[in-house]
Amino acid sequence: LWLSGGERRRLEIARTLATNPKYLLLDEPLTGIDPVSIEEIKIIIKKLKQRNIGILITDHNVRETLKIVDKVYIVNEGAIFYEGDPISAVKDEKIKKFYLGSNFQL
């Protein structure tokens, strides 16, 4: 049996939901999958938020992740470098210099 990356992500989330969690940790849920699967995972995450399930996402796909989160934490050398909302994060000059790059836009 072979599953695509997006199918594996959906299966991992479904398997975890069987335990009725209050919180989910999603490690790199948007990495290594095609754009259609990214959109499907984002829809699933939005539905989980509507069910009041807390979600912690760690992902290097910053552009897509910032579109679905309420709060952003950027970690540098093991310490929280930034804490705030996604829109403020994108506008923050220190974050642009350190992490996003000067031309980053959502």
Residues covered by each model-derived region:
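Hydrophobic anchor residue at the start of the ABC signature
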Residues: 13
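Helical segment within the ABC ATPase nucleotide-binding domain
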Residues: 39-51
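A short, surface-exposed alpha-helical micro-motif characterized by mixed small hydrophobic
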Residues: 65-67
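Conserved catalytic motifs of ABC-family nucleotide-binding domains
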Residues: 20
